[in-house]
Amino acid sequence: MVLPQHVTVGQLAGVHGMGVGFLSAGIGDVPADQTYLDVGQGARVTESLYDGSLPRLRVTSGHGGTAKVPPPEWGAVRQRADSVPADIVPGLLGTTLEQAHVAVGAGSSAGSAALMLIDEHGALGGAGCHGACPIVSVESANLAAVRRLAGHSHGDDLLIAIERPPPASNRALALGIAGSGFDGTLTSDSTRMRGFVLSTDLGPTILTRLGIPKPSDMTGEPIRPDGAVDVSYIQDLQSRLAEVGPRRAPVIGISVLIWVVLTAIAAIAFRHEGLRVALTILAASLALLPAALLLGAALEPSELGERLIVGVGCPVLAALVLWLAPGMRGLAVCAGATVLAYAVDVIAGSHLTELSLIGPNPIEGVRFYGIGNELEATVAALVPIGTGAALAGWAPRASGRAAAVAFAITAVLAVAAFAPGSFGADVGAAIGIPIGAAVSIGICLGVRRTGWVWVIVAPLAAVAALIAIDLATGGNAHLTRSVLDAGGLGNLGDIFQRRLQLSAHSFARYAESFIFWIVIALIVTGLTQWRRIEGWFGGRRTAWAGFVGALAATLAGTLANDSGALLLMIGAVLCAATVGVAWATHEERRSPTFWSPPVR
């Protein structure tokens, strides 16, 4: 049943026996017809992967009264789907139902909503049903009709009611399901988030109810209830998810901009000594920023409150940390606090990571649990930076072998927390973090030429271990679900091509940003001043190893991730901040302060 727009979860919860939640209508803002097609094909990708936009579709009555999409229009839909480096099959749900001898139909008021049940040939109910057989139908209705149908349902009847798409920007659709076993707050393994499911989960839900196996090309998962209906919780969840994207610029971007301006003012007002102090506080604040965002997710304050937590709280706490643990030690403490906070959260499964402003932004429709691209870039850089800074601050005389062991241990622990599907669910963490650690270890041990083969071996071993862990623990991560369970390693080519296209798109998008070109200027400056930067680290070889490892992890993430430009900017900023600390503390023998303790 497709209900009028603006129907609420609270209204659906008033229907007897109906479980409720919110439905992600697509990846980003998509037209209604795309949402309906996604339901029918059981898979969805970002609009940028398609060759062209979706044409306007009509569902008309054909010969014998059979509803269908005109062949030219359906041909355009199939051709558009074939252009995507993924297994997208428009009409898959309708064809699967027909092959199982299920009667498929649509009411006269269904309109384009019938696209959800159109088969692969663009027709509705093309296969006949002989004798008694199940029926799956779609139609438009109002809330009163839903109440009436829910009251008359019995046995294995299933009534699915969704708000008519598209939803308002940065919002989701209200969803209700009535039937035996669905009275509760809805969820699915696609999101692992109570109260939030995907459009691609509807098809598997219908098929599971009918006892029909889900086709391998469907990526959605069956919807199920999780606890009693909790309208207040669902509404609060929707509100918080809707705030994540819009708040990123004012809370994160403006705060960092203010910090940079204050750093420049300190340099002008207090010259060399002021810049030393300001750069160290800036780096520590940047390292603490993600941890402050996790606190914001827990407290769910107003936008002003979150800006104060980040914009004021981070520098104040950074200054306190640096007073207690000056120089590289303070940077290590701040980096460790952020990495540890998110590791504990994803392992505990509290979902604060998903609700934080640096989390995966579930309402965007791409990732719904674990860490997103922003956190992947942050963690991949902070792990080697923090490890190197800790060694330089607390164990400056550690042997190369001991330092290498430390880098290896922190990398293994970080991958164990952020890569498996049961925790951080980010395969990129199994690539970037091991590469960063391998480079740091190589510098600590002074390896030459063939010794750098471990830079290649480390991520391969980590990904292999990740697959084994997910299969053993039932992590059901994207890697195992889409590659091993749905066609084997042959799908890796499609995934690689898809990531390259999305990464190229991200560079094209960020190329219009002034911040992007500032970061590029920082990178170019760093390359031209490489020897001078190395000199600022001086005898602190472990800090230098951590810095270079962070650069390697950032480069690996940029090449392997579908948001390459974003990872490049985040990693480059954190690496530049580390250089700032190295410069600020490299003269500590001549000018000791409480920011940089004198060498004994």
Question: What are the roles of these predicted feature ranges?
Answer:
Residues 227-229, 272-288, 326-338, 399-408, ...:
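Membrane-interfacial loop-to-transmembrane alpha-helix junctions, especially the N-terminal start
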Residues 235-363, 372-396:
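Core alpha-helical transmembrane segments of integral membrane proteins
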Residues 241-252, 360-382, 422, 484-515:
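Short aromatic-rich membrane-water interface segments that cap or initiate transmembrane helices
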Residues 332-360, 365, 454-456, 460-490:
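Aromatic-rich transmembrane-lumenal/periplasmic boundary elements in polytopic membrane proteins
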Residues 410-413, 428-466, 575-577:
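Hydrophobic alpha-helical segments of polytopic membrane proteins
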